Design a protein with these regions (language model features):
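Surface-exposed acidic/polar loop and edge beta-strand patches at domain peripheries
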Residues: 1-132, 145, 156, 160-258
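Short, hydrophobic/aromatic alpha-helical segments in well-folded domains
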Residues: 121-122, 136, 150
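Asparagine-centered strand-capping/turn motif at beta-strand->loop junctions
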Residues: 137-143
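Surface-exposed beta-strand/loop patches in extracellular or lumenal glycoproteins
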Residues: 149-155
Length: 258
């Protein structure tokens, strides 16, 4: 467990996964083991969304890739590369064509192994400041590699009626619950605020959109995404790809209200 701290905040990171962000004694992150989701955060890469209706195949310029929901990056392990009192860096490296074991097999998937026809290096860094937690993503790889990126943090809810503020509109928890597994789309948006017992704002650079998901009342996932996957058929998911130009950088800033 990597622990970052300053005078009023503590961050807990377990093998690259953000499992705690406590400010003045208030925990903002969903606790693993609580109802709702078995994780606390994950990255969705190089695809976002499910592909079971597409035979677990995604079109790329180098042919079809075998993928599963939210991509194969989440099935790989992070290596810790740097750590200080207030910062930490983690890396995943992938070599084209390498088989990655799929934890969804055999219960939820027919695919035992996932592959991708491109090399890449994926870096996730955390920086705890006096007013926020910055999470940066840096993707390095082959020129022209297609990809999507989503960040999937889960926030702990402390009250019965939290409100999500986005693009000047209020979104109630019941609205997120009603959408179910598809996730509620918030398009053309770079900042979302969750108003609960305390409030926290999720500011982003590079993503451009969000989606919100939960199936319980004690947590909600507010996810910055480069593409909303449910806008297209699963067989057309490649329409949402960006193309890598050597390096791509994305930023998420979690800013607790004062």
């Amino acid at each position: 467990m990597v622990i970052l701290h300053n005078k009023n905040a503590t961050v807990k990171i377990d093998a690259g996964e953000l499992v705690g962000y406590q400010v003045d004694g208030h925990e903002f992150i969903h606790q693993k083991g609580s109802p709702g989701w078995s994780s606390a955060d994950t990255e969705m890469f190089p695809i976002i969304g499910p592909v079971n209706e597409a035979g677990f195949r995604v079109k790329t310029p180098k042919g079809e890739a075998v993928q599963d929901q939210h991509g194969h990056l989440r099935q790989m392990e992070y290596q810790l590369t740097e750590q200080t009192e207030t910062a930490a860096a983690f890396v995943k490296k992938y070599h084209s064509g390498t088989e990655v074991n799929n934890s969804k097999f055999p219960e939820k998937s027919t695919e035992e192994a996932l592959t991708w026809p491109y090399d890449f290096r994926f870096e996730k860094t955390f920086l705890l400041t006096d007013s926020s937690l910055e999470i940066n993503f840096k993707i390095t790889g082959e020129e022209g590699m297609p990809f999507m990126l989503g960040y999937h943090p889960a926030f702990k809810l402390h009250t019965e009626s939290p409100v999500i503020l986005a693009n000047g509109k209020k979104i109630l928890l019941d609205e997120v619950l009603a959408v179910g597994s598809r996730a509620l789309q918030i398009s053309d948006c770079t900042s979302v605020t969750l108003k609960d017992e305390k409030e926290i704002t999720i500011e982003t650079e590079g993503f451009g959109n969000f989606m919100c998901w939960t199936e319980v009342r004690n947590m909600v996932c507010i996810e910055p995404i480069s593409f909303y996957p449910y806008a297209v058929k699963q067989t057309e998911l490649h329409q949402g790809f960006e193309k890598l130009k050597n390096t791509a950088e994305f930023k998420v800033v979690l800013k607790p209200g004062v």
